[in-house]
Amino acid sequence: LRGGSRLSRKHIMQAADDSLKRLQTDYIDLYQLHWPERITNTFGNRSFQYAQDSWEDNFMQVLEKLDKIIKSGKIRHIGLSNENPWGIMKFVEYSKNGLPKMITIQNPYSLLNRLFEVGSTEICKYENVGLLAYSPLAFGVLTGKYFNNKIPKNSRLDLFPTLKRYNS
């Protein structure tokens, strides 16, 4: 996307402008960063593995760019998605220097997936970051869609079999 997945100032501005064009609007109420730039343990990968990838500790730069976009009137509030407790706290820490605060996080949360409660709940409670539950019906598992372990063709668990463990 946009010549790379970096959360650079250029890419953030381009992504915001592209979103405004696609939505055919003048401003966005809530703009969320969909993925952390660094490699994290998400979607079934529960153990942290240090990876010397090329991400930069650019939390401050990201917030500075988002601050400019907010001040320009293009977005009103910012949030996170697929972030872990360490990443949430880094953004909270930097926002205390007069930069905008991440007001939401959209992470998986359901009766079958309660990993958010380990670390993130406490941070979000005390730092006033709201949870927008992703996949509250566990990709349909809680609806009875997969009754008797039958997986319908082209369903999420058929298309992404590695997610079976993640939701049960």
How would you label these PLM feature ranges?
Residues 11-31, 96:
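CE4/NodB-like, metal-dependent polysaccharide N-deacetylase domain
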Residues 1-13, 48-57:
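Active-site mouth loops of central-metabolism enzymes
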Residues 36-168:
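Beta/alpha (TIM)-barrel catalytic core signal, keyed to glycine-rich beta->alpha loops juxtaposed to Asp/Glu
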